[in-house]
Amino acid sequence: MRILVTNDDGVHAPGLRVLEEIAAALSDDVYVVAPESDQSGVAHSLSLNDPLRLRRISERRYAVKGTPTDCVIMGVRRILDGREPDVVLSGVNSGQNVAEDVIYSGTVAGAMEGAILGIPAIALSQAYGRAGREKAFWSCAQAHAPGLIEKILATGVPANTVVNVNFPDCPPDAVEGVAVTAQGRRGYLVNVDARSDGRGNPYYWIAFDRPFSEPGKGTDVEALAHNRISVTPLRLDITDTPTLTRYAQALL
């Protein structure tokens, strides 16, 4: 099995090393093509106005000055060049990618690009942050991902579908099983944090507040709250079918 590994945290991210170890447990035919720098939050952006710079780190490890989407395209169309991977693995992201995170996530987008290219694809993220901790329990993903990936691939990933996997913020032995979930919803409050530099000139950061709300039943948010591994199938087709039907009746 040939595996293409990418991420959005960058080629030097600890989560990428974790995913390389996970991939190595599944296959000895693993290629890594990851962004040269952190691309968190770039979603499915594609570099059209800047050239892509490719740096070979080792025989099967490459860095691209571009987005996760660029990396998957470069990996499939240039580096592998006709030797198509059997699966694209994207991650392991430092932090969960659930609910609205999915829209912003470069990790999920890397997997989505694999699906667009007709390749089974799985996004993997490790939640963290409870009790003020600033480091992830990478051991959770390390322990549970290989077997879970094998089960997902054996079950099959349909065309135009991405599997979004999130590991809970707990040690491996505290995981309360696997939950197959729907994408959840949280109450996001998007703010602009205004600051001043040393010369008194203003600059700004996008900031998010997440007020507490009860997670929806059967969602990825609920699964993580109960220390379960969340497995969410996502489709590339984002058509709102009920509204399509209603509009067809009302507007035509």
From Swiss-Prot:
Q: What is this protein called?
A: 5'-nucleotidase SurE
Keywords attached to this entry: Cytoplasm, Hydrolase, Metal-binding, Nucleotide-binding
- State the species of origin: Methylocella silvestris (strain DSM 15510 / CIP 108128 / LMG 27833 / NCIMB 13906 / BL2)
Query: Which molecular-function annotation in GO is an example for this chain?
Result: exopolyphosphatase activity
Give one Pfam family, short name only. SurE
The gene is surE
Q: What class of enzyme is it?
A: hydrolase
Question: What transmembrane ranges does the database entry give?
Answer: none
| Annotated binding of a divalent metal cation, by residue | D8, D9, S40, N93
Regarding protein family, the annotation reads: Belongs to the SurE nucleotidase family.
Tell me its cofactors. a divalent metal cation
InterPro entries cross-referenced by the UniProt entry = SurE, SurE-like_Pase/nucleotidase, SurE-like_sf
User: EC number(s) in its UniProt entry?
Assistant: 3.1.3.5
- UniProt function note: Nucleotidase that shows phosphatase activity on nucleoside 5'-monophosphates.
